[in-house]
Each structure stands twice: as C-alpha cells, then as structure tokens.
Amino acid sequence: MAKEKFERTKPHANIGTIGHVDHGKTTLTAAITMVLAEASGGTAKGYDEIDSAPEEKARGITISTAHVEYETANRHYAHVDCPGHADYVKNMITGAAQMDGAILVVNAADGPMPQTREHILLARQVGVPALVVFLNKVDQVDDEELLELVEMEVRELLSSYEFPGDDLPIVAGSALAAVEGRDDHIGKDKILELMAAVDEYIPTPERPIDQPFLMPIEDVFSISGRGTVVTGRIERGVVKVGEEIEIVGVRDTTKTTCTGVEMFRKLLDQGQAGDNVGVLLRGVDREGVERGQVLAKPGSITPHHKFVAEAYILTKEEGGRHTPFFTNYRPQFYFRTTDVTGVVTLNEGTEMVMPGDNIEMNVELIVPIAMEEKLRFAIREGGRTVGAGVVSKIIE
C-alpha cells in the first residue's frame, strides 16, 4: 500500500505529556486522539496502543516513547508520551523528542507530587518554552475549594521554576470520562477546551529554514584549483553562494565567503536546512578548518568553553559506568560531530554521581565550541556513551 502523502497545510508543533506517575498522562493522550479524531479527523489511539511504547535509540541511549499525531482546526501536532519516569528524563535531556510545549498532567485529588516538580524543573532546564496544565480526575474531588487550592499550588510551583504560573492556562477535567464517552461536561468538552488552550498558548515553533544558518563541519577536502570544501548537514537556515559566513569553534573565529554549494555532485545556488552539502570556502586552506567547527551566519553563534548542564548518567545495564564519579571527572563531551575533553565540577552538596542519576553539573572544555543554550551533547569515555546532557546556561 502506498504511503499517505503528508499534507502540510497547517502549522506543525511538537508537544508531549509530562507529570507524576499514574496522574493520567497516557489516558489523556488517548483521550485527545479520540476527541480530536471525532472533531477534526485523524486516528483514535487506545490506551494500550500508547502504553506499549517501542524502544528507540537516541545518542546511544535506549528510550521508550510513544508517538501519536492529531490535529485541531488550527494546527497539526506530533505528541510524545513516555511509559516510565526514567524515559522522560532521558527523552527531555537527549532531545530525542523535541518539545515546543508540554501538557503538565496533575491528579486533582493528589496535587503536585515529586515527579511533577522534577518534570517542571527538567522542562525549565532543557528549554521547553511553554506549559499548559490539565488537572485530571476531577470526579474524585467533591470539594470545589480543594480544586482551587490544588490549582493555586500548581501555579506557585510553576512560578518557582520561572514559568508564568499566574498566567498559564489550567483546565480541569477527567481524561477517563472522555475516553469512556461519558459526562461530557468534565470529559470531551474539557479535552476540547484544553486543546484550544494548547493551540493558543503554545507558540508555533520557528521552522529550521527560517533560523540563522548553521552547519556542523563533518569533513574537509581540498579540491585542486578550486579551494577547500567542507561537508555536513545543514542544521538550520539557508546558505547562498556569495554570502559571508563564519567558521566558529575550536580556534579563533574566522570569516570567509561561500563560493559554491553542491549536493549529489550538482552545483546549487543555495543549501537549506536538512540538506547534506559540500560548501566551497574562499581563501581557506585545508589546515584552516576542521571537523567539530561550524559554519554559521556571522554573529549568530559564539564559541564558549564553560557552561552549566543538565545531564543523565547511564546505568550499568544501559551500557554506562559501573562506578560513581566525582568532581574533576574528565570525560569527552561529544558536540554535533566531535569529542572535546572537559572537566566536571559538581554542585556543592553533591559528593558524587551514581549511574542512573540526573544532575546539574558545571563543565569546562579544553577548547571552545560553538555553543548556545539547549545544545545537546553525549558524554563519552573512550568512544562509549556514558551519559547525555543539554546546555542549560553558558558561563563564558
């Protein structure tokens, strides 16, 4: 059977459900697909279909994630839901499932729980731009005042992690009622209200092609009579022949001009996000550029060597370390296309890090790398992945 063509008529956004175990993330995911399938077409997915998430590998780490898609009148969504807490941690840190926004699910009867807090912190650290809250299982709360208290508590918690707790939308309902097709006033109607809030409140992401040009350099060739060609996959933006570009990272930043772009041995006027290309650089010799640097629009990205990161350290079972590590740990940090050695400093009060932990840590690299917040990396020892991280704050 021929694959259905993906009709890109509506803006697209990636979202996910986050929150404490058993607060109803997967039931809500099922409810959204069912209600929207009826409202605007698409395929309804049952709880069991979503819950038996397949495993995937991202940056050498195995993660179970369920992907569903659905659409509202205004947008098309790709939605991720993870079965276990560890999968969320890994997913958010590796960026395996990029989230433009998330729905935080809180059981109205319990209020915020430890993982609620942890997922909000992770969302803050990895740069999820916007959250919308669904207070679930409202049929288990008899007292209207109790609901208001839980809502206040959730808003305060969000504010304490620098989300706009007072302003972000909170919808209260029952995902199970929606799945079972009963009590529309707390079921289906609330799911539609939630998705209207998501449509309005979660910003449409800027498409990669509209962002400033960036291409990680994978390889460097010298072509006699023509000069130096660097190859790689354009991560974002567009590069046109004749444009000035910068080579950033590892060494001092230099400027050059793109004198040619080729793909599959054909010459192009420009390369754009997603293309695997060779870029011909004017006046740069073979030794003047290396793997690990990036080509970028001038002024759009700068090299840094000190940063704060949120990291997940693999367990022994996942192929990670068997022993803890301490301050002054010196692994390799794999950014985009290359390994760079760095020194880890742990926060005060953190004596050591055990396999399976997720932590905040300070890193100082031996050479600077083109860096910005939200940049993902792998932590490696001798070529084997022992962790994953994301830059949460640049120091210098």
Swiss-Prot record:
InterPro entries for this protein: EF-Tu_GTP-bd, EF-Tu_GTPase, EFTu-like_2, EFTU_2, G_TR_CS, P-loop_NTPase, Small_GTP-bd, T_Tr_GTP-bd_dom
Organism: Maricaulis maris (strain MCS10)
Protein name as annotated: Elongation factor Tu
Residues noted as binding GTP in the record, renumbered to the chain: 19-26, 81-85, 136-139
The protein's assembly and partners: Monomer.
UniProt region (G5), positions on chain: 174-176
Originating gene: tuf1
Any one annotated GO CC term: cytosol
Domain tr-type G residue range list: 10-206
Region (G2): 60-64
